[in-house]
């Protein structure tokens, strides 16, 4: 009996949940380190190390992203953009540096089954005629002052606050984690760095604009309406 009880504690339950349930309405997934099954979604993009999956049955909660990254370089050969698939895997939180916010993803995907192909993939529009990011406040932890708490983005993951995407910049982008998006009216505000990454701002209201065409970071009214674009995706 004791041996059976010990084994049961080590076994991770396999849960049938949706993508939005996996992402949840906070920065970290409520299913972290748990095995999940029968995850259904539309393949929206592929990278060299995995692919992105969007729920085919979205909910009405704008705090929970409908998309998620599937991390596995071998799995990409089994699917194409536009496929509707189901799979199982393990929910993980990943960041490549302790100063970064975690990204929710599914690792070790298995039981990948394609139910249909050549489905239309429509990106979410951010900017004119689409979603607009908030422009005044960074997060619910800094009390309106980007130079105050949390002082670095990693503490967001420690507190794991409830997302408020219409109010806070970090929450807005987190609510779109893993999503394929079209951003309108992009304007570069820096030169490319050594990796070719460029900070840009889109066709949405922003604060801190300066005479050089860039954005100035300042406390109490700092804009969180720009971002760094660097991921290369396969969309066909």
Give the predicted meaning of each segment.
Residues 15-236:
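Extended non-catalytic accessory segments flanking core domains
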Residues 1-16:
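Fungal secretory targeting signals
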């Amino acid at each position: 009996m004791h041996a059976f009880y010990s084994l049961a504690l080590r076994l991770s339950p396999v849960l049938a949940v949706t993508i939005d349930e996996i992402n949840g309405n906070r920065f970290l997934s409520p299913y972290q380190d748990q095995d999940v099954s029968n995850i259904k979604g539309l393949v929206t993009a592929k990278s060299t190390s995995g692919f992105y999956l969007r729920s085919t049955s979205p909910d009405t909660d704008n705090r929970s992203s409908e998309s998620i990254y599937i991390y596995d370089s071998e799995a990409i050969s089994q699917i194409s953009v536009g496929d509707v698939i189901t799979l199982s895997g393990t929910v993980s939180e990943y960041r490549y540096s302790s100063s970064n916010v975690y990204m929710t993803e599914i690792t070790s995907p298995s039981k990948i089954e394609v139910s249909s192909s050549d489905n239309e993939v429509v990106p979410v529009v951010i900017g004119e005629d689409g979603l607009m990011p908030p422009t005044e406040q960074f997060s619910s932890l800094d009390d309106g002052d980007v130079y105050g708490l949390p002082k670095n983005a990693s503490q967001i993951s420690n507190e794991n606050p409830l997302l408020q995407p219409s109010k806070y910049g970090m929450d807005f982008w987190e609510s779109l984690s893993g999503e394929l998006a079209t951003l309108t009216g992009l304007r570069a505000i820096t030169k490319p760095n050594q990796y070719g990454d460029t900070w840009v701002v889109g066709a949405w209201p922003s604060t801190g604009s300066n005479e050089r065409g860039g954005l100035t970071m300042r406390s109490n009214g700092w804009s969180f309406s720009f971002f760094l674009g660097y991921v290369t995706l396969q969309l066909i």
